[in-house]
Amino acid sequence: MLSAIFSRFLSLKSTTLSVLLGFLLATEGTAQSTGPAYDAAGNILLPKGYRSWVFVGANLGLVYRPEIQAMTSREAARAETMAFHTVYIDPAAYAAFLETGTFPDPTVLVMEVFRGETRDADGALKEGTFPGERLLVELAVKDPQRPTREGSKENWAYYIFPGDAESDPLASAEAQPDSECFACHRSHASHDNVWVQFYPVLRERRRP
């Protein structure tokens, strides 16, 4: 894994390479994956160890305006539940983003969706909302070499892994139709199909 990642970044500046090297040293010997991986059917595999990737930010209770394309039936159902989103990016893509301000091929972003809770088991909380039960995991993947591209000419694909507190997410998932996630991201995400406007870690480094 180390040689494959370093081959992508031989031309990066030393400061950017330091970011990547620090991640690799911190995670050496643990079960990690970076970049997209697919099964024999062309479905994407849920990355291992993604919670140790670069955390780009979180948000609570985002609800799109009903008249815009983002409000699909799935988003409408999600809007009924106050939800936390926590987002991670694979370290190799983040190192490249620091250098160029753009998302390289490939890039993987993972978003966990949690139910917002206002009451803790011990009853200690007076006010506030915290992440409770996990509802699902979603992936945004920029990979022009991805399999199962029939009917799609887009570099970005989106995947949904159902899985709550009672069960682990599915091991693999197929790409959503372009008319669902991709169309919304293309219309409203601020930078290369990513909602960079919601995450200052990325927003401050993007380039036109």
Sequence positions of predicted segments:
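N-terminal secretory signal peptides that target proteins for export/translocation
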Residues: 1-11
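Sequence context surrounding c-type heme c attachment/ligation sites in exported
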Residues: 35-39, 46-54, 58, 100, ...
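Detector for methionine-enriched segments
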Residues: 1, 15-16, 71, 82, ...
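Bacterial N-terminal signal peptides
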Residues: 11-26
